[in-house]
């Protein structure tokens, strides 16, 4: 059973090459995990893939993506959109 946080952490490690120990709720993608703007776009796309299903595409609008600066912000956003721990 994977929590939303664990899934966000997995995607962050894969996309950003970050160390697992560094991907904590308060971590900033840019400041703590070294993501540049392109990395952040690719991270959002990977999150859309991770949390979408073949039957229900999951999309994070650019206006929302711009606000997702930390790991916890992403977790909170996903939960607000109905994503649950599995």
From Swiss-Prot:
4'-phosphopantetheine is transferred from CoA to a specific serine of apo-ACP by AcpS. This modification is essential for activity because fatty acids are bound in thioester linkage to the sulfhydryl of the prosthetic group. One of its GO terms (biological process) is lipid A biosynthetic process. It comes from Dehalococcoides mccartyi (strain ATCC BAA-2266 / KCTC 15142 / 195) (Dehalococcoides ethenogenes (strain 195)). This is Acyl carrier protein. It comes from the Bacteria. It holds the Pfam family PP-binding. It is found in: Cytoplasm. NCBIfam families: acyl_carrier (TIGR00517), PRK00982.1-2 (NF002148), PRK00982.1-4 (NF002150), PRK00982.1-5 (NF002151). InterPro entries: ACP, ACP-like_sf, PP-bd_ACP, Ppantetheine_attach_site. The lineage of its organism: Bacteria, Bacillati, Chloroflexota, Dehalococcoidia, Dehalococcoidales. Residues 2-82 form the Carrier domain. Pathway: Lipid metabolism; fatty acid biosynthesis. Carrier of the growing fatty acid chain in fatty acid biosynthesis. The keyword Lipid biosynthesis applies. GO terms for molecular function: acyl binding; acyl carrier activity. SUPFAM superfamilies: ACP-like. Belongs to the acyl carrier protein (ACP) family. Keywords: Cytoplasm, Fatty acid biosynthesis, Fatty acid metabolism, Lipid biosynthesis, Lipid metabolism, Phosphopantetheine, Phosphoprotein. GO terms for cellular component: cytosol; membrane. The modification O-(pantetheine 4'-phosphoryl)serine is found at residue 37.
């Amino acid at each position: 059973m994977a929590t939303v946080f664990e899934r966000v952490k997995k995607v962050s490690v894969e996309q950003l090459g970050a160390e697992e120990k560094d991907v904590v709720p308060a971590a900033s993608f840019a400041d703590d995990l070294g993501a540049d703007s392109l990395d952040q776009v690719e991270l959002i796309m990977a999150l859309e893939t991770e949390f979408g299903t073949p039957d229900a595409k999951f999309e994070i609008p650019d206006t929302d993506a711009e606000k997702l600066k930390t790991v916890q912000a992403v977790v909170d956003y996903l939960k607000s959109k109905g994503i649950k721990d599995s």
